[in-house]
Amino acid sequence: MKKTYRVKSDKDFQMIFSRGKNVANRKFVIYYLEKEQKHFRVGISVSKKLGNAVVRNAIKRKIRHVLLSQKTALQDYDFVVIARKGVEELNYQALEKNLIHVLKIAGLI
């Protein structure tokens, strides 16, 4: 994922958390904030409680892959995806299904 599609700074994360809306399902929480830009930006947060660095990075790679596969359908928002406990046990298809479900609830797809 290109750098222009990432939310990296702490200031941006805090703005999304404080001013944005949120939706959740059992596996993900999404905070989102509408911004005037040409494309979406995403930040991904995976807690250390979910596993070691290898597991957490694998989860982040899967989330990024799902988001890139839905790139044309995603609305122009800044959003943060937070993985909840249990995500580490999901295979790619189940993770994709859960993530797309919560994105549809939020109206981002």
From Swiss-Prot:
Consists of a catalytic RNA component (M1 or rnpB) and a protein subunit. PANTHER family: RIBONUCLEASE P PROTEIN COMPONENT (PTHR33992:SF1). RNaseP catalyzes the removal of the 5'-leader sequence from pre-tRNA to produce the mature 5'-terminus. It can also cleave other RNA substrates such as 4.5S RNA. The protein component plays an auxiliary but essential role in vivo by binding to the 5'-leader sequence and broadening the substrate specificity of the ribozyme. GO terms for molecular function: 3'-tRNA processing endoribonuclease activity; ribonuclease P activity; tRNA binding. Pfam families: Ribonuclease_P. This is Ribonuclease P protein component. GO terms for biological process: tRNA 5'-leader removal. GO terms for cellular component: ribonuclease P complex. The keyword ATP-binding does not apply. It catalyses: Endonucleolytic cleavage of RNA, removing 5'-extranucleotides from tRNA precursor. Its EC number is 3.1.26.5. Keywords: Endonuclease, Hydrolase, Nuclease, RNA-binding, tRNA processing. Belongs to the RnpA family. The lineage of its organism: Bacteria, Bacillati, Bacillota, Bacilli, Lactobacillales. Coiled coil: none annotated.
